[in-house]
């Protein structure tokens, strides 16, 4: 799917906002990347897991990632993208954003964990990034 110049402009805006937020947060010593659930919750503390199926989750309830990985460093704590605008990542983000601009749904749901009413992404961080910026 070819993406539009408009969706790429949105990426450049999201990227510029991300860099500004990173610089401000660094000065204030706030966390720079999304929180990782495995830093909050030890596996031994989990009494049960349940598969609720596919749910619609408001983007404001998605607050972090399930596991600490190198991918979480591609985002600000609010999932704004920090990869350079001429990267493969930016091209993929633009394609996802184009889906949102056309009022279509993503072809694949994200997977995540819920803990205390907040959601932590396992798979689908780019989709979350595009959706959070779009909302």
Spans of features found by a protein language model:
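Short, charged/polar connector segments at secondary-structure boundaries
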Residues: 1-116, 122-126, 132-133
């Amino acid at each position: 799917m070819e993406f539009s110049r408009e969706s790429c402009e949105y990426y450049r805006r999201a990227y510029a906002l991300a860099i500004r937020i990173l610089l401000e947060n660094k000065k204030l010593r706030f966390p720079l990347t999304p929180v990782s659930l495995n830093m909050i919750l030890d596996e031994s503390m989990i009494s049960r897991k349940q598969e609720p199926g596919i749910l619609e989750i408001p983007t404001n309830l998605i607050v972090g990632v399930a596991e600490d990985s190198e991918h979480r460093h591609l985002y600000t704590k609010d999932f704004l993208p920090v990869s350079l605008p001429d990267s493969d990542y930016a091209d993929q983000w633009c394609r996802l954003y184009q889906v949102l601009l056309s009022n279509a749904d993503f072809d694949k749901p994200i997977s995540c964990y819920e803990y205390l009413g907040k959601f932590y992404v396992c798979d689908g961080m780019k989709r979350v990034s595009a959706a959070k910026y779009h909302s």
